[in-house]
Amino acid sequence: MISRAAAPSSSIASLSSRSLRAQAPAARSFATVQDNAPPVKHYGGLKDQDRIFTNLYGHHGADLKSAMKYGDWHRTKDIVLKGHDWLISELKASGLRGRGGAGFPSGLKYSFMNFKDWDKDPRPRYLVVNADEGEPGTCKDREIMRKDPQKLIEGCLVVGRAMNANAAYMYIRGEFYQEATVLQRAINEAYEAGLIGKNACGTGYDFDVYIHRGMGAYVCGEETSLIESIEGKAGKPRLKPPFPAAVGLFGCPSTVTNVETVAVTPTIMRRGASWFSSFGRERNAGTKLFCISGHVNNPCTVEEEMSISLRDVIDRHCGGVRGGWDNLLAVIPGGSSTPVLPKTICDDQLMDFDALKDSQSGLGTAAVIVMDKSTDIVRAISRLSTFYKHESCGQCTPCREGSKWTMHMMQRMEKGQAREREIDMLQELTKQVEGHTICALGEAFAWPIQGLIRHFRPELEARIREYSKEVGGNGPYAGGWHPEARAEGKLISPGM
């Protein structure tokens, strides 16, 4: 017990309690926390006046007169006369990144052809536009070619001036007959108006535009395969270096870039880099075309602000997921080659390069494939494996053999005809393919499978156990591996 003598007097006690209260920090109320917190910025809800592709839904004609009425070819002469240095610096300041999937900074990419003493090089220089849109789920470039062809042609002139190119070659997917027809008609109109060709737009700059139609090979979407195809060779990737900027089309300096990346450039030059960079998060600037398909009420292609949330773009423009957001199973966010994301991640997912990379997926071409709970997710990824096996050019052994093995293994996983340890083997196989092929097709068939195993492994394991019960397999026969399975046609194994 504390003695009375040791106890402080009431005056001393009140003084020390006041001093303690003065030293202690003030309690932070809810309002105080909110006042000191940085404001949260929400992305999306792009206004019509900020949309670059004003004719995405074909509300007006695709002819030159209609295009000029809506702002195309406005003061293009002034833009071209500013020279390549200004164009490159403006593109770098805008933060534009490639819209074909890789997301490489466009201003930096276009500067590669302006190497030291480039003007002393007697070789012609080419801009190559990749319009070979073959990624399953992707349908943005074809809308530009069908509805806004003049925007693409004007973009070719501006981008070509930035890299001092003499001509542009547009490589169009072979199945795009209507798109090629509309685009050729638009090119003819531009030639007749003096906008391209000799003394393009009255600038003294000569620039021609040509169309080259492909023959349907998916691998020709890779830049060096595309170049090989234009040259009349088999569409197979080249080893790099040398890079196309040094030795490209016909052995001349060339830059291969996406349709959307080219088409947005003139608008950026007219409105300014600061306008474009005001949209989206840092390093993810601008607007983007999103192709939303699958189990939504209104599938569409729409232009929206970068960094918009996945749920917002689906609810705002597609009428939501079929059966409601709670009926969502998974989403492939950037075309068939990007890893699938489950609903738990999709709830708060932002749609830009860095945010999707943090979620172990990718923006890719921004082709959003929505799958509700009625989807057989294993079968969906198995179908993609079949597609990539069919489209492999066979040049690289890891891709040629790996795509075949993964296709057969996914067909087995689809039916549960496997052992649980084979899931790990399949994942290891896909990781061994990454980085060991000339082009990115190896990663394209590996990543969807990795995403499936990462997020839906319990589904694979459940199928294996279910099939094991059906055939009465235990121990060495689990998963259907019994001696008569092959003869009965119940087992699908590599090599059958």
UniProtKB/Swiss-Prot annotation:
Cofactor binding comment, as recorded: Binds 1 FMN. Binds 1 [4Fe-4S] cluster.
Range of the transit peptide: 1-30
UniProt entry keywords in alphabetical sequence: 4Fe-4S, Electron transport, Flavoprotein, FMN, Iron, Iron-sulfur, Membrane, Metal-binding, Mitochondrion, Mitochondrion inner membrane, NAD, Oxidoreductase, Respiratory chain, Transit peptide, Translocase, Transport, Ubiquinone
Binding residues annotated for NAD(+), in chain numbering: G98, R99, G100, G101, A102, G103, F104, P105, S106, G107
InterPro entries: ComplexI_51kDa_subunit, NADH-UbQ_OxRdtase_51kDa_CS, NADH-UbQ_OxRdtase_suF, Nuo51_FMN-bd, Nuo51_FMN-bd_sf, Nuop51_4Fe4S-bd, Nuop51_4Fe4S-bd_sf, SLBB_dom
EC number: 7.1.1.2
Keyword Ion transport among UniProt keywords: no
One Pfam family named in its UniProt record: SLBB_2
Name of protein: NADH-ubiquinone oxidoreductase 51 kDa subunit, mitochondrial
Subcellular location, record wording: Mitochondrion inner membrane
NCBIfam families, A to Z: nuoF_fam, PRK13596.1
Major location category of this protein: mitochondrion
Organism: Aspergillus niger
